[in-house]
Amino acid sequence: IMTEEGGMTYSGAGVDIEAESSAVASLISSLANSTRKKGTRGAPVDLQGGFGGLIEFGSNWLALATDGVGSKLQIANSLSRYEGVGMDCVAMNVNDLLCVGAEPLAFVDYIAVPTPSNETHSRIGKSLTEACMRANVTLAGGETATLPGIVTELDLSGTALGWLPAGKAIAGSDIRPGDVLIGFPSSGIHSNGFSLVRKVVSKSGMSLTEPCPVSPEHESRSVEFD
């Protein structure tokens, strides 16, 4: 977010974080009585600040996360470039499980389109498959919906399932001075903040088909693990 005077912000790009948070709070308050009794299989586990939802499952907990690629898809749609969006979708979900200490196990996708396309679906499918292989999760299924009266462009989201031993969730409450923090270099902005990115591109007069004004080849562009 640009904070200098005259700069651009998320709200200026059409994303009101406070309004979104308020809407989410209203949704959650309406769901308060929809859960199973504590101590039974499937009952919710209270985890403040977590991006994944936890439920009881015997001596273990199951973790669920759902997310989409966001407005980055508008760039992919305009360029007909879908090779990486499956990777984005899987990563957004499994990362939300990992940050609470859960091991991702399986993933399902949801694709909404105004008109189905064999070529587009094939490219997305290959991207999802590669992403699931890298994340070591099972691509368990999904749903494709043709919704010409609702969507005008392809939309992609997914849900990931993971597990962890009961009571072993990471919430940050056990962090103490002197603990070792491990940081990984980012290979880019991934799937967050693209409403602002598109606004910057539009205001600058640049085109998505022009050469990148900064070097796209950075040492942190790709991280390999043994």
Residue ranges and their predicted role:
Residues 2-226:
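Helix-biased detector of long, well-ordered alpha-helical tracts
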